[in-house]
Amino acid sequence: MTSISNVSKGAIIRFKGEPHIVESLVHRTPGNLRAFYQANMRNLKSGRNVEYRFSATESVDVIITERKEYQYLYMDGADYVMMDSTTFDQINVSEAAIGSGSRFIKDGITLTIVFSDDGAILSVELPTFVEVEVTETSPASKDDRATSGTKPAIVETGAEVNVPMFVQNGSVIRVDTRSGDYIERVKK
């Protein structure tokens, strides 16, 4: 157990028996009231966001974590099969553990898996940006190039991304895995 004042953004704590990642932690000292810490956390099992007010003297249980690099190999039913980059051990990871970023996982991508002190998978971190090929989008016309709108495109992983009008089938684009937004066209 450690004081809430020693916890920082990104720490994983046990809150009400469940692992939560601290997304923001702000110290507040209102007028004539006692100081407190306002925390925004995300439950790593359910994915729900939780807001909680800790007193300045409160203690929390910080979970000791281990981060390892894994490479995606293939799908096995509803699970993703990953291989440890150093020991070549394989593990199965559920889609729920990966979250919404699972739509950008492609063969050979390297992910970081966060394990708890008891060996359970807490979260899976994708690279911030991935490069994917556009497989299906509407053809561009001469008028489209003069406007600055977007159009939907299907990428090689099956995800749908809104792209600028100039992007065509076969183009390689960089996408932000956190939001699913188009970043830029990659020139190869």
UniProtKB/Swiss-Prot annotation:
Localization per Swiss-Prot or TrEMBL: Cytoplasm
Alphabetical GO biological process terms: peptide biosynthetic process
A GO term for molecular function: translation elongation factor activity
Top-level taxon of the source organism: Bacteria
InterPro entries xrefs: Elong-fact-P_C, NA-bd_OB-fold, Rib_uL2_dom2, Transl_elong_fac_P/YeiP, Transl_elong_KOW-like, Transl_elong_P/YeiP_cen, Transl_elong_P/YeiP_CS, Transl_elongation_fac_P
GO cellular component, one term: cytoplasm
Keywords associated with the record: Cytoplasm, Elongation factor, Protein biosynthesis
Pathway(s) where this gene product acts: Protein biosynthesis; polypeptide chain elongation
Alphabetized Pfam families for the sequence: EFP (PF01132), EFP_N (PF08207), Elong-fact-P_C (PF09285)
PROSITE patterns attached to this UniProt entry: EFP
Keyword Ribonucleoprotein tagged: no
Keyword Cytoplasm carried by entry: yes
HAMAP family associated with the record: EF_P
Protein purpose: Involved in peptide bond synthesis. Stimulates efficient translation and peptide-bond synthesis on native or reconstituted 70S ribosomes in vitro. Probably functions indirectly by altering the affinity of the ribosome for aminoacyl-tRNA, thus increasing their reactivity as acceptors for peptidyl transferase.
PANTHER family: ELONGATION FACTOR P, ELONGATION FACTOR P (EF-P) FAMILY PROTEIN
UniProt record similarity statement: Belongs to the elongation factor P family.
Listed name of the protein: Elongation factor P
